[in-house]
Curated annotation (Swiss-Prot):
Keywords of this entry: ATP-binding, Chaperone, Cytoplasm, Isomerase, Nucleotide-binding
Ranges where the record places region Disordered: 525-547
Source species: Nitrosomonas europaea (strain ATCC 19718 / CIP 103999 / KCTC 2705 / NBRC 14298)
Biased composition (Gly residues): 532-547
Record protein name field: Chaperonin GroEL
Subunit and partners: Forms a cylinder of 14 subunits composed of two heptameric rings stacked back-to-back. Interacts with the co-chaperonin GroES.
Gene: groEL
GO cellular component: cytoplasm
Lineage: Bacteria, Pseudomonadati, Pseudomonadota, Betaproteobacteria, Nitrosomonadales
Amino acid sequence: MAAKEVRFGDSARQAVISGVNVLADAVKVTLGPKGRNVVLERSYGAPTITKDGVSVAKEIELKDKFENMGAQMVKEVASKTSDTAGDGTTTATVLAQSIVKEGMRYVAAGMNPMDLKRGIEKAVTGAVEELKKLSKPCSTSKEIAQVGSISANSDTEIGRIIAEAMDKVGKEGVITVEDGSGLENELDVVEGMQFDRGYLSPYFVSSADKQIAALESPFVLLHDKKISNIRDLLPVLEQVAKAGKPLLIIAEDVDGEALATLVVNNIRGILKTCAVKAPGFGDRRKAMLEDIAILTGGTVIAEEVGLSLEKTRLEDLGQAKRIEVGKENTTIIDGAGDVKTIEARVAQIRKQIEEASSDYDREKLQERVAKLAGGVALIKVGAATEVEMKEKKARVEDALHATRAAVEEGIVPGGGVALLRTINAVSKIKGDNHDQDSGIKIVLRAMEEPLRQIVTNCGDEASVVVNKVKEGQGTFGYNAATGEYGDLVAMGVLDPTKVTRSALQNAASVAGLILTTDAMVAELPKEDSPGAGAGMGGMGGMGGMDM
């Protein structure tokens, strides 16, 4: 086991503060509309330019192991805030640095760190309650666009395109971000349910120019097994032919004479059909077939529920207004399923999302919700160079997270004002002793810090602005982008409540742990053995080896 170095008390705390300051100082230059960029070196390719706090934090690794521990603790604040709210990472870092800095002064003065921590926790609980009172629902498209713009560093174009995407696919819809091919941002929307399986034979194509099979008001047959024998299919094909409607078959696979017969019937115009493989694999395939059945008002023909292909009736088939089948995708538009049944299915999948343990499962379940509840929107980010593309894409993703958070928990005035407005309520909270009161004071001071940093990044005098904003009430604040004072909500400077709340809670949580640290243990750096660094000429460099 390698030898360890142990530091205690003030020596340990000083190292932690140094690490916290290095990371926080690098991150906080990005805060606000006039925040600066940070350039991150890459071992290959062009460097990355970013204004995203968590991206900067993740890059920082310090040589001194004790300082590095401090930096890693604050990195955790940024990462946790990014995971829960998707934005607010820089605010969280600024808050954590302030709480640690102020707190260490009180610890050095001889106060009890545990009581300071309890005071900090009381203040944060009070501030969160006050934030909830300040919060108002984010419902209009205009507000969604404003939240998106602020999160994307005052880029109104990004805010607009996100609001448009949410309008099209609903608040539950999936919005994905991809690299575009031009200079402009583009929005593609897929309405209805789309899954990544295309036609099994090009002979099903009905529109030669678009290369798709378009079925108007079709029946949908869902089967969880492979279909090879045409005899199994004949009864249902005859019923569909009598009804005079097209048929889409979704099964594990369709091949052999079954596929050949369907193709021949299609070419001759006897019965318009199309066959596709069921999406997904294993249990996920069963679940997705069930989703399609609920969406189209049909039933999955499966042996385990006592249904067979030969005995299938028209009532077992699903229906839709239109289905388009391409080479790689199938889109079901306006399925005939019962709205209440669809809502119940969505609620059931949401419950599974809450219980899902892996991010992959959660993502796949979220996609299923979107396909049932809304649709899928694709934002294609346009840029002139790859470096700009990466930076812009990261901002779009940030803005997307922020707008989702705003829809979830509402919005508060932005620009660091929401935290300032909680100061009155928090200052009335009393601790159990003098040290706890000091803990509350630490948070009161920290809650000014985001606004101070925004103003500092603009090149203005922070104390003057903070005092002027404190004199105002409600949504009155400082718009750093224009340098004006006024009603921030009217100006469109908004923050999601969830982002502000998460930033404060996560910052206080980690800062509290740092303040109550009294000993640190780290591995001693390995010393090079003598002679190991010498040249290899005549094997002289091997002097450190035992022969």
